[in-house]
């Protein structure tokens, strides 16, 4: 679609407008943002559009659309899908060896699990290897409660953080300010970093990882604007 507007503004309800008309989501709802900072950031994406609209250059708009349409339609179900990552959290699956990798995982992941234990009154079953280990029912329930408590926009921002790291604990630690984006990404990438150190990295894997890091960063930015 070609650009058809000249002026981008924000109305009193924090709805982004194009030549005075509200931007609408794919579900035809006005795109109303919950904070001035996010409204301005989304408006800036629309101001930056060239001759044609490219959704890939408007990731904050995309997450806002997700919050306003599919997540708002059934936030409990969406939150449950995110909370399910706690049942097979990356941090609970450790390498069997070599010792330096085991130690690196423990140094990064043990403090995060300890934080979650104290914050949410949960316990975790940790294993070596990739075979699934069931988490205590109380842990699953309490982590679910923690995620369901978030509003639609925070769920939208949390989604790429959790899905790209494979860790609900990392996502919760980040949104609560326990760790920053760089520490979160580093914790999630320990296994990949080890493989690169041992055997090198091909360009396709490097490109894919860079794309994932960018998408992860958008989620972090989105959360920071709320």
State what each model feature region is.
Residues 1-73:
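An N-terminal structural lobe/cap that precedes and organizes the functional/catalytic core
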Residues 30, 97-104, 153, 157-161, ...:
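Conserved aromatic-histidine-acidic binding/catalytic patches
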Residues 48-51, 117, 121, 174-179, ...:
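Generic secondary-structure signature for well-ordered alpha-helical cores
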Residues 55-58, 128, 200:
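Short coil/turn segments at secondary-structure boundaries
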Residues 76-142:
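Internal, conserved structured core segments that host functional sites
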Residues 131-205, 218:
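An internal, amphipathic alpha-helical element
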Residues 206-226:
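Long, charge-rich low-complexity segments
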